[in-house]
Amino acid sequence: MHFKKIAFALTALTAVAILAGCEEEASKTMHAVNINSTEKTVQESPKKGIDRDHTITVNGQEIQLETSYKVDERNLNDYVFTTPSIADLSVKLKNDAPQNYNIRVTNLYADVSVSSKYSRFNGLRQDSINLNLTQAPNGGYDISTTDDYTQPFQIESVNQNESFIHGWNGYISEHYSYLTERDIKKHSNGAVLRTVWTLSIEDTQTRKTYSKTVSDTIFMPSHNEE
């Protein structure tokens, strides 16, 4: 009887070891500095991305804008779903605006969702932000050709989002388990970043204020297409 108990325990330990060996390792993370490090200079990871041109019209006058989206260079063509990441979102004037205009950013909405050929997964939202900037002293943040407004968007891992996990497994399913990078990439080809910038244009001559929006949709591939 004692021998049977030992044999059962060994079998159970073997099963645990096999399961542990099959578990997918955590995805690669951003560079982190050890808190015990004596290094004082912080080295930012190289960022790469895309710039987009926009034109808004106020009282028949055109204003040129440039939006910019950058991510860690290592993830440029290898978007990672299961590790938090940061996308730098920014906007500025591309050309000088009329002198009587003060242009400010008053709101930024952004979200990241899955891009997939399967309707069940396509559009499933990973994370989002909605920033009301009207509480700033001037009712927003001024931008010019030399001064942009930049907002780092810290995108949470899909495994930090309970709604995403339920959506991936099916809302009516009772199955709940953390998702692996391998499984998500098997059913998707990347992520889509959508942004809406709300701008306030103040005419200092007439004392009127106008509101305009510009939006972008940016595809971030998670692997090269075969």
Where in this protein do the model-derived segments appear?
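Internal, hydrophobic beta-strand segments that form the core of beta-sheet-rich folds
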Residues: 160-206
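Short beta-strand elements
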Residues: 204-226
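Bacterial signal peptide processing site
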Residues: 23-25
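C-terminal motif of bacterial Sec signal peptides marking the signal peptidase cleavage site
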Residues: 18-21
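Extended, solvent-exposed segments with strong compositional bias
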Residues: 127-177
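Short, solvent-exposed beta-strand/turn "edge" segments of beta-rich domains on protein surfaces
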Residues: 73-86, 97-102, 182-188
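Extended low-complexity, serine/threonine- and proline-enriched intrinsically disordered segments
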Residues: 100-139
